[in-house]
């Protein structure tokens, strides 16, 4: 895809994220790897008003185009691309259940085999840091090295993938897992978990099965 096509795909993903109930207002942000940096949503602009020319290019050193302001979270997007060379897209949102768990500062353990969509046997929750800060970007780099999906304490969710379709799909799956986990926690009962051995079997199967989404 060329820049205009990638920019439109970013906008389409933002609109779909809202349609799916994963985000609201101007919260959240989306990016794709481009050249030596990334294309990312602008700061503070409602998704339905975005045009392709509003999407901002930020190079690998964090320098952005003149007369454009990238999302305030551009630092952690860049940290994902630096940490995971295979990642070509990043989706960040404040979905209800993921944000709820993040407020509790709880990772999602192996409550269900689909936790393995993260690429590991749990979904981490990284420590709180102010949005847009270098410290938050550092926490994200540590967490995303371990898992393709991470919760940000008192904040929300980040997912990454080979393309935007996969990153958005992963965000949907993690939101469902978060909703299950919150409901389980509300029972006050001890929650049985899958063992590391059981999750390793699932992870092995996912390597050969995988998610086959071709970006449109």
Curated annotation (Swiss-Prot):
Cofactor, how bound (note): Binds 1 zinc ion per subunit.
Record-linked Pfam families: Aldolase_II
GO molecular function, one term: zinc ion binding
Record's GO cellular component terms: cytosol
Binding-site residues, substrate: 28-29, 43-44, 71-72
A Gene Ontology BP annotation from the UniProt entry: pentose catabolic process
Annotated Zn(2+) binding sites: 73, 92, 94, 155
Methyltransferase keyword on record: no
Catalytic activity, EC: 4.1.2.17
Domain of life, source organism: Bacteria
UniProt family annotation: Belongs to the aldolase class II family. AraD/FucA subfamily.
Record function comment: Involved in the degradation of L-fucose and D-arabinose. Catalyzes the reversible cleavage of L-fuculose 1-phosphate (Fuc1P) to yield dihydroxyacetone phosphate (DHAP) and L-lactaldehyde.
Subunit structure, interactors included: Homotetramer.
The protein, known as: L-fuculose phosphate aldolase
Organism this protein belongs to: Haemophilus influenzae (strain ATCC 51907 / DSM 11121 / KW20 / Rd)
Lineage, top ranks: Bacteria, Pseudomonadati, Pseudomonadota, Gammaproteobacteria, Pasteurellales
Gene: fucA
